[in-house]
Amino acid sequence: MSVNDQITHIGKTLSTTASAFLNYQKSNSNTQDVLTNNGPYKNLLSNTVNNASSTSYFYKRTEHGRFVKNASNTFEDIYSKTRRGDVFRNKFTDNKTCFRMLTYISDDLLNEIPTKEGLKSDADGKLLTEGGENENLRKNASKKETSLFQGFKSYLPIAELAIENTERLNYDTNGTSGTVGAKDVMSKTNERDEIHTELPNFQDSFLIPPGVETKKISSSYSPSALKSFSQTLVNSLEFLNIQKNSTLSEIRDIEVEVENLRQKKEKLLGKIANIEQNQLLLEDNLKQIDDRLDFLEEYGLEVIEANSDENAEDDGMSERKALKNDAIRNEGVTTESISSEASNLPPRRRQQLRDDNSLNRLGAFYSKSKKRHRKSFPTFQQLYEPGTKIGSIMSTHDDFLTCLDFDAPFGTLCTAGYLDHTVKIWDLSKQNKIGELAGHLATINCMQINRDYGTLVTGGRDAALKLWNLNLAQQLYQETQNLTSPTNHIDSPCVYTFEAHTDEVTALSLDPSFLVSGSQDRTIRQWDLRSGKCLQTIDLSFANVLTTSTNVDLSKSTLLTQRNERPSIGALQSFDAALATGTKDGVVRLWDLRSGKVIRTLKGHTDAITSLKFDSACLVTGSYDRTVRIWDLRTGLLNKFHAYSAPVLSLDLFQENAAVVVADEPSVQIYDSEKDESWSCVEQGNETSVSTVKYKENYMVEGRENGDVNIWAV
């Protein structure tokens, strides 16, 4: 084979291989079959092997996997070359031939590149047809496959721009056109990546082909010059079309990758959800075991472990049953005897006997052994985008929700509705009803959950405060649903009733050891949770506290007040010996519970305060004057305030200097005072106003006027 034949043969091999890989992108063939299924490539491979006389020729030229030089230099090892020009240098070639081999492919070879449809370029090698061709040639021209050379050439402007930006980066970095220092390699690499990412953006610059001038086009009288401009522009259009198709292909690849990542994320989210469901199940089982142990201890039903043999086990089981039956009989006798004995006592003595039993139960309930600590807390809500609706519970009550509270994300939710005397308990993970608390005689205004003891405190318009055992309430409700026990159960989920207020309870705050309540009777009372006693009473019947910003006659009873009436004490919160109250006159007062005196007043609201929350640094208040104000507790000064188009009905502390706000609108507003911006959680198409809200650990629950409850990630 002559030198020219070798050159031609190598050129055809390169062209055929490149075309095969380009066509592979538009076919569904397997990657391993790209070359083996290509006819022209197989023919060239066969000719190469035949011209080599025998495959053993290649093995003879190798030693330990590398080609060995010989005196004739007829076969070269490309791995042993230090310069690219030495690869094809031998006794048959010179420097010019090597340069041609490395840099030039003739138009004839480009025109012979096979395509998927078996089409070839025009004989003159033009990229686009011009005037004079028939319509079929025009259609075929648009269907031609892009060659590897055309793809390289179309990206030359982008490559030049990349080189220019890299040189500019190096110059801007160290003031010269040299290379970047080794210590700055990582940072400079990141900067280069950002520049390369922005390379395809041609919004600010339009590339005009060299040799084409717009002024000459409008003033030229030379047909040859105009035809030359036309050909250049046609070629440029073809190059731009190649770039566009390649970019579209990259976009499609990115979309596929994004979809794959989205599906992978959904699978991982489902996995985390299952894990947290299992954690909640195990937590519930642990709680049931603890409750069962307490039950056995309370009724004296503990049985010594039996021996390992069957007889001993049977004896133990029979003994357990006997003890249980005796305990039940004794309990029945005791209950009957107490009832008969109490019936013979005077009314005041009967009430005292009931109070003593209730106090004993309260003290036993708040013993240290009753305190529960969760082993794990849900974090699934943190994986949602802020403002994402997680779920909803429809029609929890017939009228608007007056208050709600929950213990933890995806945990237990308690709700109360207007003119509804019961509290309903819901499972936030399954979004179904799991319990009910009946005992109040009027609408329930406020509530708070203590998740350490599994309790709920409620305050209603019947002037009563009630402490509930949520775990027992759920067990009784489940037994009632399954009809596994009589309906006249001895136990009651109401652990204790705090009775001292003479008018409706409008606000409360639950501390680890104390309960603080505010009422329409213009008093604030502090209660001991272990004894049930009222430790102190703070009277708010002093000047200008309850006389402004209202037209309501306070001399009348408010047990049947209207829903829009301003409460005397709209909100309060306590922590240790600190107490903050918001009253009808729009003034926030900070109290020291040890002395029962006001230590600071915060004035700024012009109407009754409806809600407040504080932490170690700031205090957030909402009012009927349609504003939310954030106060600095250290200085007592107003930091920021934000105005709304409707009265603020409820709020909760989102984070420092930020709050979740309900302003009698269909959306919940999240106000960030540091950034001085507000964004909302709104459900499209739902025009029902929000009446109350609670937030904990990136998890928000809001109640609406139609009784619906929505759950959000924020």
Swiss-Prot record:
The question of whether Phosphoprotein is a record keyword is answered with yes
| Subcellular location per the Swiss-Prot or TrEMBL entry | Mitochondrion outer membrane
Q: Which domain of life is it from?
A: Eukaryota
Which portions of the chain have biased composition (kind: Polar residues)? 332-343
Q: Where are the WD repeats?
A: 396-436, 439-478, 500-539, 561-603, 604-642, 644-681, 685-714
Tell me the keywords, alphabetical order. Answer: Coiled coil, Membrane, Mitochondrion, Mitochondrion outer membrane, Phosphoprotein, Repeat, WD repeat
Q: Record's InterPro entries?
A: G-protein_beta_WD-40_rep, Mt_division_protein_1, WD40/YVTN_repeat-like_dom_sf, WD40_repeat_CS, WD40_repeat_dom_sf, WD40_rpt, WD_repeat_multifunction
Which residues are in coiled coils? 240-298
Phosphoserine found at = 376
Q: Spell out the residue ranges making up region: Disordered.
A: 323-354
Report how it sits in the membrane.
Answer: Peripheral membrane protein
Task: Give any Gene Ontology cellular component.
Answer: mitochondrial outer membrane
> CDD domains attached here?
Mdv1_N (cd22881), WD40 (cd00200)
One matching Pfam family is: WD40
**Task of the protein:** Involved in mitochondrial fission. Has a partially redundant function to CAF4 in acting as an adapter protein, binding to FIS1 on the mitochondrial outer membrane and recruiting the dynamin-like GTPase DNM1 to form mitochondrial fission complexes. Formation of these complexes is required to promote constriction and fission of the mitochondrial compartment at a late step in mitochondrial division.
Q: Its family?
A: Belongs to the WD repeat MDV1/CAF4 family.
Q: How does it assemble?
A: Interacts with CAF4, DNM1 and FIS1, components of the mitochondrial fission machinery. Interacts via its N-terminal, coiled-coil extension (NTE) with FIS1, and via its WD repeats with DNM1.
Name of the featured protein: Mitochondrial division protein 1
Q: What is the lineage of its organism?
A: Eukaryota, Fungi, Dikarya, Ascomycota, Saccharomycotina
Q: Which gene encodes it?
A: MDV1
